[in-house]
Design a protein with these regions (language model features):
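HDAC/HDAC-like amidohydrolase catalytic core signature
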Residues: 1-156, 162
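Positively charged, low-complexity/disordered segments
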Residues: 160-161, 166-168
């Protein structure tokens, strides 16, 4: 079986402004490099029941985020996390990417998967954006695994308290 790359063109529409370290070129550089490897499977994010976001994040936070996407320009959710009109679809596709990765591995469509997404999703807390992250895609993945496949094994090589603070 092969490795899958799950990504969406909406990632480049999540704009953060000049000088911000989390830029569209982060994903385009990765995907352009990976396209040279012909043995990879390329796939798009899955559609998903957005209620899973409210199982990971406070309902008020999810509702606030959905109402916050500007029609034009940029808006700060916190001191680091910026959203733009294109962020709305990018956030949904980032979460849909982790769900597609899980389902693809579980259904043996591919051996493993890498999600090349923006905005990133591992620092957001239960009720606030943090560290460029709007939703905690990692916590959503954990929740989805527990609900759909009834197991979870998690190895986190960085500071784990963000994920654990959401999970418990």
């Amino acid at each position: 079986m092969k490795t899958a790359i799950i990504s969406s063109k909406t990632s480049v529409n999540h704009l953060t402004g000049d000088g911000h370290p989390e830029q569209p070129k982060r994903v385009t550089a990765i995907t352009e490099r990976l396209k040279k490897n012909k043995s990879l499977i390329w796939d798009k994010p899955a559609s998903f029941d957005q209620n899973i976001l409210k199982k990971v994040h406070d309902e008020n936070y999810v509702d606030m985020v959905k109402k916050s996407f500007p029609n034009q320009g940029l808006k700060f959710l916190d001191g680091d996390t910026i959203i733009s009109p294109g962020s709305k679809d990018a956030t949904v596709d980032a979460v849909g990417s982790v769900i597609k990765a899980i389902d693809g591995v579980e259904q043996k469509k591919f051996r493993n998967a890498f999600c090349a997404v923006r905005p990133p999703g591992h620092h957001a807390e239960k009720n606030k954006a943090m560290g460029f992250c709007i939703y905690n895609n990692c916590a959503v993945a954990a929740q989805y695994l527990m609900e759909e496949y009834k197991y979870l094994s998690l190895i986190h090589i960085s500071e784990p308290t963000r994920l654990l603070s959401i999970a418990y």
